Amino acid sequence: MKMTFRWFGKEHDTVSLDHIRQIPGVEGIVGALYHIPVGEVWPLDDILELKRQVNEKGFHLEVIESVNVHEDIKLGLPSRDRYIENYKQTIRNLAKAGVKVICYNFMPIFDWTRSDLAKRRPDGSTVLAYEKQKIEQIDPEEMIRRIESGANGFLLPGWEPERLKTIKPLFSLYKGVTEEDLFDHLRYFLEQIVPVAEECGVRMALHPDDPPWSVFGLPRIATNKENLDRIVHMVNSPANGLTLCSGSLGANPANDVPDIFRHFLRMGRVPFAHVRNVEIHANGDFEETSHRSCDGSLNICEIMKALHEANFQGYIRPDHGRMIWGEQARPGYGLYDRALGIMYLLGIWDSLENEKKKQEGEKTCSRSIQV
């Protein structure tokens, strides 16, 4: 298991690589190019510059999150082929820079969706939260305004202004698009890009929908075990993988998250995992919590056990953290609580390793980065 940390770059992040270096056990950075419009080719020189910055601090850059998919591809428009060709070239360029895993999603229009970016918890921390009634009572444009006003001036992943300024025309285009249509459009995309990923030694890793149900009447398909199983069998290749996100899938209590992890780990289709916790309320609303099992509705210990039992050799990162200790940062992506999350996840992992190896007298943790 390779522990990583998402970083938004010098221009977009309050968290520095020097601070990340001080978190024990972090080996790599999960990064992206945020100045390239969705659908355009990522230039190799820009990728190499990001890699240089990351390598300079002793980290690897082997996971990219995300190379977003243009809406024309999701809609199945005739113009999709141009954007698919651009996507292929981006895969090739990332592979040349040593990238092994590309995370992406196939959610129409919106990426992750929340009603609140700073809901106050009983302990005084603030978290991302989803209240169904709030979402149902506002139109998409109002939600965009609320998200932007609550973002503390930061660019939020999946909420790129150049895409969202065309919100009304996009909703018109999606009128009548069904889940089956979206499955067909994803299949077309995968049939084109997976062979390129295979040639380049890259694994594509689809992120589940967040939350895993329809929002504003838009179709969503990466929502449960059955649908994800259908997706990985569309193109039966190890390069057609998943980013299993416990918090996204776990927002629906019908999803048995440890079982989902075990199922796809057995298939060898999990190159990347996001592990975080959520607290689900009786009415179906949810809010994010610390990573600790007893603080939310998910059994994080059992999820980590599933990864350990599978001898997971892929990449993992903590996900959305609380805002704690007065930190001012991008909602969900501060330093402190994600660092606490890492130590919790590594503590579980070390305990499992110790149980496995206690008769062998081996040490259970790897050394921190030395530069």
UniProtKB/Swiss-Prot annotation:
Cofactors required: Fe(2+); Mn(2+)
Sample GO molecular function, one term: manganese ion binding
SUPFAM superfamilies: Xylose isomerase-like
Record bears the keyword Iron: yes
InterPro entries: Man_deHydtase, Xyl_isomerase-like_sf
Pathway in which this enzyme or protein is active: Carbohydrate metabolism; pentose and glucuronate interconversion
Short name of one Pfam family: UxuA
Keywords noted in UniProt: Iron, Lyase, Manganese
E.C. code: 4.2.1.8
Name of the top EC class for this enzyme: lyase
Catalytic activity: D-mannonate = 2-dehydro-3-deoxy-D-gluconate + H2O
Biological-process GO terms, alphabetical: D-glucuronate catabolic process
Task of the protein: Catalyzes the dehydration of D-mannonate.
HAMAP family noted in UniProt: UxuA
Family: Belongs to the mannonate dehydratase family.
Protein name: Mannonate dehydratase
Organism: Geobacillus stearothermophilus
Lineage: Bacteria, Bacillati, Bacillota, Bacilli, Bacillales
